[in-house]
Structures are given as structure tokens and as C-alpha cells.
Amino acid sequence: MKRILITVVLLLGGYLAAFGQEFERMVFTAEDGTELNYRLLRPAETAKAKKFPLIIFLHGLGERGTDNDRQLTWGGNMFLNPVNMEKYPAYVLFPQCPETAFWAYKDIPASYDALDAEEQMPAPFKAVKEMIDTYLTYPDIDRSRVYIMGLSMGGMATYDMVSRFPEIFAAAIPICGAVEPSRLAGIEGVSFRIFHGDADTDVPVRCSREAYKALKEAGVKVEYIEFPGCTHGSWNPAFCRDDFMEWLFKQKKSRKYQK
């Protein structure tokens, strides 16, 4: 009985240590002078691994701003969950796009029929890429396990980032996002998991269906999960899936596709 109590105390202590951690407030300054607010969650203090995954979370339109808080509205608590922190330790970045800007495009797309990439990356998007590059120099970052995800506007930016720099990422999770399908043809070595609600009136569900089809035809490892009756907030049922973190952390980039 005494041994059981000691075990329980040790386990509880581990959970409390993880739960006590918070997202740190950070600012990244890009080479062009762009300042990007972001929040950083470090691996749980109890984690024993020598190298950890790097996760980038790109928020949607409604979380833009300068408060360095709103970007945690969706997804932040999932990573702070003490069970997840203990089981899935990682460096997690939540950058915040300024209120007057957009991640991947200069403005909200007038049509989802032709989402061509901007020739020049928007300044916040470019700053995110530079921030990723900076973290990849850290010795305790596992370069074979770099994951990116995003919802709505952030889902579009997830597609955009991976289509431009597929060599960096092991996995991508675009949620209710959109992309010009032809831009996915050259992607190799990245696993995708796409989520969308079939009743979405903000970003049409066909955007994810077409992206899934394009990735499948390109031979990319991809899974598509569609939620019947769900409107734009498909991130809610996505984050509630028991296998959300498990699937993500199983993905590892082969050396063949790393540069």
C-alpha cells in the first residue's frame, strides 16, 4: 500500500509540474525589421528526451491583433493539457498575425477557385519562416519532427508554407483551409491530415476535398476527415479527437526528404 501511495504522489507531482507551465510571451524580429508577437510553450519540465518536436500553430482571421493573447483562443488549452504535456513534450509556437495583415495572402481571397501564391511572401508569413529557421538551429529540436497546423486563414497558410518549403515539415494539419490544388503536386515526404465541416459557409468544403484529391494523386500520405453538419468551427471536433496528438507525434520525416 505504501509503495502504491508513493507511486501516486510521484505521478501527481509530474502532472502538477507540467500543469504549472504556461506559454511564454515572446517577440521575434525578422531580418526586414518586422516584429512578430508569439507565444512559446517549452517541453514539460519532467520530459527526459534529448530532442523534441517543433510545432507551429497558425491561427485564423479572428485571432489577429497585437495583444499576444488571442492566438491562443483555439488550440492553446490542448497543448497545456497536463496529460498531453507529459505524453507529447514539444516546443510549440503560436505566432500572432497583425490585425491589418494576413498570413499567406494580401487580403481575404475574393474566390477560392484560384488561390495562387503571392509572389512576395507577406511580411508576417516571412517572419514565421525565419522564426522556424531560428528554432531549427537549437540543438534539442528534432529536425525530423517539425509539424505545422492551422485553422481557416491559418489552414491556408499551412498549405502555403508546406508547398514552399516541403523539406522542413514531417506533417501538416490544415483545418478548414484552402489552396490552389496544383500547388500540391511537388510535395514529398510530408504527411497530411485534413479536417473540414461539410456545412462550412465561410470556406467551402470542396476546398479540402480538392486538396485531398490533389495530394492523393501526387502520392502524398494524406487522410481527410469531414464532419457532417459542422460549420466553420471544424477545429473543435478535430481537437477533441482522441488520436489528434497521437497521429501527429507518430509522423517522422525520412532523411531522404530532408535538406
What does each model-identified segment do?
Residues D133-E188:
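Primarily recognizes the serine-hydrolase "nucleophile elbow" in alpha/beta-hydrolase
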Residues A18-L54, A90, P124, E130, ...:
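A domain-start/cap signature at the N-terminus of enzymes
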Residues T73-V83, C176-L184, R206, E210:
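Alpha-helical scaffolding within the catalytic cores
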Residues M1-E22:
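Bacterial Sec-dependent N-terminal signal peptides
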Residues Y88-A90, I187-F192:
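Short, proline-enriched alpha-helix->beta-strand connector loops that line the catalytic pocket
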Residues E45-K50, A104-L151:
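Gly/Ser-rich "nucleophile elbow"/oxyanion-hole loop immediately N-terminal to the catalytic nucleophile
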Residues I175, S191-K259:
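C-terminal catalytic histidine-bearing segment of alpha/beta-hydrolase fold enzymes
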Residues L61-F125:
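Active-site machinery of serine-nucleophile hydrolases
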